[in-house]
Amino acid sequence: MKEYKPQEIESKWQGVWSEKKVFETPQYSDKKKYYALVMFPYPSGTLHVGHVKNYVIGDIVARYKRMQGYNVLHPFGYDAFGLPAENAAIAHKIHPKKWTLDNINVIRGQIKKIGISYDWNREVITCTEDYYKWTQWVFLKLYEAGLAYKKPGAVNWCPSCQTVLANEQVKDGKCERCGTTVTMKYLEQWYFKITDYAEKLLEGLDRLPGWPEHVKTMQRNWIGKSTGAEVDFPVDGMDRKIRIFTTRPDTIYGVTFMAIAPESPLVMELVTEDKKKEVEEFLAKVALEDRFKRTSVEAKKEGVFLGRYAINPLTNEKIPIYVANYILYEYGTGAIMAVPAHDQRDYDFAKTYNLPIKQVIKPKDGEWNINERPYEEEGIMINSGPFDGLESSKGIEEVTKYIEEKGFGKKSVQYKLRDWLISRQRYWGAPIPIVYCEKCGIVPVPEKDLPVRLPENVEFLPTGQSPLTLSEEFKHTTCPKCGGPAHREVETMDTFVDSSWYFLRYVNPKLDDKPFESDDVNYWLPVDQYIGGVEHAVLHLLYSRFITKVLHDLGYLKFDEPFENLFTQGMIYKDGWKMSKSKGNVVSPDDMINKYGADTLRMYILFMAPPEKDAEWNDAGIDGVNRFIKRLWNNYYKILDIINSNDTKNENEFGKEEKNLRRKLHAMIKKIKEDIEGGFKFNTAIAGLMEFNNQLSDYLENTKSPNKKLLREIAEKVVLILSPFAPHMAEEMWHDLGKETLIVEEKWPEYDPEALKEDELTIVVQVNGKVRGKITVPADASEEEIKNRAVENAGKFLEGKTIVNTIYVKGKLVNIVIK
């Protein structure tokens, strides 16, 4: 019998696929298109099996769809700009470009060894000029549309990485890259106006039934739509108003102080001379605190009175104005009307500073002791002048209407979403295509002059300013408008800009006069199946949706959502932890391939758990899958020996065992298709293969003269089903079956409904609901015949009793009711 030698087989068939260009996708085809895409990786080093899971899931989908007759686009690339390359370059004294490209070469080799069916002709690398030229083009299109702008403001600053971070890149007050506590800094920065698309981004989520609900919820929460009112509170003794936003205008009669964020310019504008020193000391103290922790419900509430009062426009009461540590400058207007009776944080602050607590909402049923804790729910308005007795929902409406009529404010919709900060003070990123001219001001680089090349001979140690500042050659240029002296923008773009459109570039990766051909992109997009980690739910997915919508509105795309269906895979853990070099728990795919072969690795990754769930790597588990693969291989070659033997007995006749085994074969084919199409249940699909292999083993061991016709059908069907999961051994088996085609180009097998029909049925016999026996009847037996057989079978339990009713549940049981 032929021995299973995975490394030989895998190398052989990978060579054949490459030589015959099997996975190169034609741009157009009579076939229906299918775009299968996995999130491209950051090339930070070698892959571990946790990364491989993503690619194997994508490969099953691509291979399955190809076998179903689709024209499949299945590309790959690298998100190659970013801080880790720069930090590694600093640590190892190697240029980021070399470090990145060396890593890419290693990763590419690893992926090819796993047998992933990528069209390598479409590979994109975001740090190459032919890619970032078009990232710069995206920037210019947003700039022309008024969606890219520069403004000064407070930004998140990582002292270790020496760069600005978007809000989304701050986790619990720390840099998500290095874990350093984030501080505040005032800088002029470039932004994309994603807030203009807040409503479109929300609305689009309702048109994505193929996305997991939890991902859509995360995006909705991040966008954070709130409906309420903006209200102006005049400052007593000044020609100045403080505008606040509130979702609860029904509580306005309960305002007892105003609170302003420490970062707001209003603080120093309003503070009186006698309070200035105390306020400045407070601001200095708060600047050292974690902004995200200080604004949490649990954090200690602190502030300083500014020495001024505001006037409540509805009551004309004077209320003190404080700077308070629990107010975030970025949310709403950076100032709030504080209603301690109905907000926990305001309540805590009021208790600390002995401020009044005035109840203006009571529960619909019963009373509430406001001295014990605030009442934060909706209810009935009290102590609210003409609005007393109104339910909160009606009160919100009426108070808003009143302030609009009186000119105190207006109805307003606010979003938690802030504009996307894209400037980075680092080297390894796409240069921003802008020049500054003393005469013309800010001037965009013309499209014909792209790319603005990233110079290679640059000192990139972090100093707090962009390393490009130190490159005289890069910095000095001429103004595209007037031809006079000018200097380039020295900051680079956030790498999320690179990844916000890469799925478009795969369609025309080698096009040099435009980023993509509109007709081609509109044929292939949106992506039919996108696969990646849930950690990208907010950042990458939100930004990609935004850029797609902008390009749609500018007329470049006919679609406005990039990803039709989204699947988020679970992580692979080892020893209870996410795999990482620092924890020493990394499992290398190379080691597994050298020991077991790529097909075993693929099968184990898919078998260990439902693909959307996290799973624990287990060496005994991969051993078990390897044993199954060898048993399947041995059964297959036993079948080939039988088929190729001179024994002509039993060629056409199917006995009971043959019919039963064929039924199980077609039941497996049916189930595996349902498993793949019904939520990527690859683990249960493989379990189905294992179960059938056991049934096949029993047949081969216990049948003296196995049926060749049936075995030939089994050999063909099983290897076709195996093909997406273990493609190398499937190719070898297919070839040894005498086939001249490649199995990757074959059709997925369909089950035969006739084969699923039972010749006989086993019917459970019950008496008054208790099982009393079983009967075997012909599958075409009538109901009357089955009932009669059941009564006969249960004879001894019916003696001396009267049959009241006989109930037949088709194909399952007969229940005889007696008394």
Curated annotation (Swiss-Prot):
GO terms for cellular component: cytosol. It is an enzyme of class 6 (ligase). It is found in: Cytoplasm. A motif ('HIGH' region) lies at residues 41-51. ATP binds at K581. GO terms for molecular function: aminoacyl-tRNA deacylase activity; ATP binding; leucine-tRNA ligase activity. A motif ('KMSKS' region) lies at residues 578-582. Disulfide bonds: none annotated. One of its GO terms (biological process) is leucyl-tRNA aminoacylation. It comes from the Bacteria. Its EC number is 6.1.1.4. NCBIfam families: leuS_bact. Belongs to the class-I aminoacyl-tRNA synthetase family. This is Leucine--tRNA ligase. It comes from Fervidobacterium nodosum (strain ATCC 35602 / DSM 5306 / Rt17-B1). The lineage of its organism: Bacteria, Thermotogati, Thermotogota, Thermotogae, Thermotogales. The gene is leuS.
